Curated annotation (Swiss-Prot):
PANTHER family linked to this entry: OS06G0237300 PROTEIN (PTHR24206)
Gene: PLIM2A
Protein name: LIM domain-containing protein PLIM2a
Assigned keywords, A-Z: Actin-binding, Cytoplasm, Cytoskeleton, LIM domain, Metal-binding, Repeat, Zinc
Signal sequence coordinates: none
Length: 226
């Protein structure tokens, strides 16, 4: 079996990678055997890796080195002292100057976002778990999201809610109505059309009912004595 013409190079060892041994992540190519944590050399899989400036880590060591204190300069120095390696020796000054004291906040939940869990879209930062469709809650990706006034949607529901109607006015109006309903604290009072008619509760006198009374007022006929 030959793989003539392949030019893919492993990001870790810079050697040719053939299809049978290929892993592609974040636009970079790796041998499966080279896809390892820089800190502990443990083998990584797609579900348990993290990266910083192209350097690979398992999630436990990434959190230990970067996330716990929020100060990347301190964590890099601690990592280098505990277990020196080529990547940490070359890169701490660049990373620490860029990430020291990060104050990025998630546009959805307003909490701090660390690089391990950050998605950046249209100048806003999000936790990966917060980057979801507002309508259905489904996870979004760079290629599947749409937004209106900073509100996130999947493209399917964006098309369903907005594009099919050809106007956004009904969306803004629905939001305004919802806010007014919430501030009123309950249902609105009934209109005049639904108020009971006071006169309807007074029954009208019937002719049959009035007849006995009228008959009682007639003078009795005289009695004829024999």
């Amino acid at each position: 079996m030959s793989f003539t013409g392949t030019l893919d190079k492993c990001k870790a060892c810079d050697k040719t990678v053939y299809v049978m041994d290929l892993l592609t992540l974040e636009g970079n190519t790796y041998h499966k055997s080279c896809f390892r944590c820089t800190h502990c050399k443990g083998t990584l899989v797609i579900s348990n890796y993290s990266s910083m400036d192209g350097v690979l880590y398992c999630k436990p060591h990434f959190e230990q080195l970067f996330k716990e204190s929020g100060n990347y300069s301190k964590n890099f120095q601690a990592g280098k002292t505990e277990k020196p390696n080529d990547h940490l020796t070359r890169t701490p000054s660049k990373l620490s100057s860029f990430f020291s004291g990060t104050q990025d906040k998630c546009a959805t939940c307003k909490k701090t976002v660390y690089p391990l869990e950050k998605v950046t879209m249209e100048g806003e930062s999000y936790h990966k778990t917060c980057f979801r469709c507002t309508h259905s809650g489904c996870p979004l990706t760079h290629s599947s999201y749409a937004s209106l006034n900073g509100v996130l949607y999947c493209k399917v529901h964006f098309n369903q809610l907005f594009l099919e109607k050809g106007s956004y006015n009904h969306v803004h109006q629905a939001a305004a109505n919802h806010r007014r309903s919430a501030s009123s604290g309950g249902a609105s009072p009934p209109s005049d059309d639904h108020k009971p008619d006071d006169t309807a509760s007074i029954p009208e006198a019937k002719e049959d009912d009035a007849a006995p009374e009228a008959a009682g007022e007639e003078e009795p006929e005289p009695v004829v004595e024999s």
